[in-house]
Every structure is written in C-alpha cells, then in structure tokens.
Amino acid sequence: MDKGKKVETVEKQENSLPWVEKYRPTTLDEVAGHEGVITTIKKFVEEGKLPHLLFHGPPGTGKTTTIIAVARQIYGKNYRNMILELNASDERGIDVVRDQIKTFASTRQIFSSGFKLVILDEADAMTNAAQNALRRIIEKYSAHTRFCILANYTHKLNPALLSRCTRFRFSPLKEDAIKHRLAHVIEQESVDLSPEAFQSLLHLSSGDMRRALNVLQACYASVDAGEQISEELVYDCVGSPRPADIRTVLQAVLDGSWESALHTFSYIKQSKGLALADMLTAFAVEFQKLDLQNKTRIALLDGLSEIEWRLSSGGNESIQTSATIGVIKQSMELEASS
C-alpha cells in the first residue's frame, strides 16, 4: 500500500472512532482521578508484584481504562497477545469459564516471560456456578496468570472470589477531573460549547466520564459546522428534563388549578419527549433546594417514590401524572398548615 494512503486510512479510522475510545488514556499517568488507587497500582507494577485485582464502582469511572493502561505498561506493544478480555454480561455461563478462560490461563506464550492477564468485565453478571469455577481456576493457574475482575456491585460476587483479590473502589469522578478531560477533547475537536451547556454537561454526567464524552459527541453530531451547542441541546441529547421546565411545572402545580396544572405538566412532558420517571427524579432534586420542614420533605419523597414504584410495576403514566400533582399539592398544604 502507498505510504500516503496508509496514513490517510489511519487518520480516517481515528476520526470514525467514538470519542470514548479515541481519547481513552493509554498510560496510568493519564487516568483522571483516583490518585490513591493509581499510586498503589503503579507500585505493584514497578515491583513486579501484581496481585489478582478487583476494581468495583459505578460505570464510566475508569475501571477498564486503568487495567488496560496497566497491561500496556507491563507488556508494551505485545499487550494484545498477553491479555484475554471478556465481558461477563454477554458471556456469563460456566462454559466460558471452562473453555475460554481455562484454555487461555493454562497455556504459556512462546518467547514471552512473566504472567498473562485475564480481564473480566461486569463479572457481577456471572452465574454462581461460573463464579465458583472461576475461583478454582484462579487458584490453579496463579503461577503464570493474573486476573482482574471488574464489577459495578461487589455484593453480587462470591465471597470466596472476593477474598482472592486486592480490592479497589472506583468512586464517581470529581467534577474537576471530568472538566479537565472534557476541555481537552473540546479543544482537540474544535467544539463550540456555550458555558451553560458545559456546566450542564458536567452536572448530567454524575461522575461518569463515558457518559460525558458520549453526550458531547452526540451534541456535536447534532449541530451544523460552526453552530454553538446550547444548554437545551445537551438536555435533549441526554433525555433529561431541563431545570427551567421542572420549575415551570412546579409553579403551575403550586399556583394554578388542578386542570391548568395537569395541562402544563402534560404539555411539557409530551412536547419535550420526557418520561415521567425522569421528571420524578428532577422534582426530587428541585425540592432539595427548597427550605422545607422535615415532615414535608418526607411526605414528598415518600409520595414520589410510591409513584415511581407504580410506574416500574406497569402503572398507567397518565394516572401517575395526576397522582404526582396530588402528592405535590398535598405536601405543600402540609407545609402551609404547620
């Protein structure tokens, strides 16, 4: 292949990549946040004493990125041949453990020294039988294979499996860490983002870097060249209610009649394409900002959680919309009577 064409092909592939992959850190120094965790893992790698690892925490907090950076540091360019990466939520049965993992763990790489690495993502989705089989394989092949288990929830993992790993908690990323990374991507991709949209993106990411980058890319793809990304577009891409819309609904519920409140509520819900479940969460956030008595706050949250439960159980959304108005009006009457 002509050298010029090859360079052009590589650039084209990079441009077509999701930004989550395109800007994924390749070294431990580039990983955002979790300074304490990264420092400890660096020490393990430098001393050549990497134990079996368990990274747990919410999605988008850097679990996969960190272990891939570890693999790159240990194996260099050869890292793809020395790791087995599986998503346990897709392949969660005992056959995967018996076949793929056991086969990989039991064979040595020719011309390669040191241990191999098995990365098991979303391991909390594995069946109990598969987890028990994995525990036995970890015991048997520890001499030349290391295991890194990634999970959102540790309570779904076998205690015997947990005891064989060194655990690290990946908390939701702090706003500053996400802000720094987003600013880098915005500069590299020449994204025109309003200050209000940037703040909304930080707020809606809720400590999830993956979500922040995916929403940013979706917004960028939605606008014409040179057009600025607005705060409203960010909320539309996420599918979350805008705070201004939530305040409008609350004002209508508190000030108007039942009919006008229901009309305003239904209009905003339908015109913005919002789900009532998302609006309930937004109401709860908005009520946290108000100076309410404890008993009022309890009544509100108790009522909203009851409606959320009914929705998840298949309740009619129109009826639950009316019920939401009732909960808010009743709670505010309780506040006024005290």
Swiss-Prot record:
Coiled coil: none
Molecular function terms from GO: ATP binding; ATP hydrolysis activity; DNA binding; DNA clamp loader activity
Keywords for this protein: ATP-binding, DNA damage, DNA replication, Nucleotide-binding, Nucleus
Subcellular location(s) per record: Nucleus
GO cellular component entries: Ctf18 RFC-like complex; DNA replication factor C complex; Elg1 RFC-like complex; Rad17 RFC-like complex
UniProt binding sites for ATP: 57-64
Signal peptide interval: none
GO BP term (any one): DNA strand elongation involved in DNA replication
Family matches, as Gene3D superfamilies: 1.10.8.60, 1.20.272.10, P-loop containing nucleotide triphosphate hydrolases
Family statement: Belongs to the activator 1 small subunits family.
Quaternary structure, from the entry: Heteropentamer of subunits RFC1, RFC2, RFC3, RFC4 and RFC5 that forms a complex with PCNA in the presence of ATP.
Function: The elongation of primed DNA templates by DNA polymerase delta and epsilon requires the action of the accessory proteins proliferating cell nuclear antigen (PCNA) and activator 1. Subunit 3 binds ATP.
Descriptive protein name: Replication factor C subunit 3
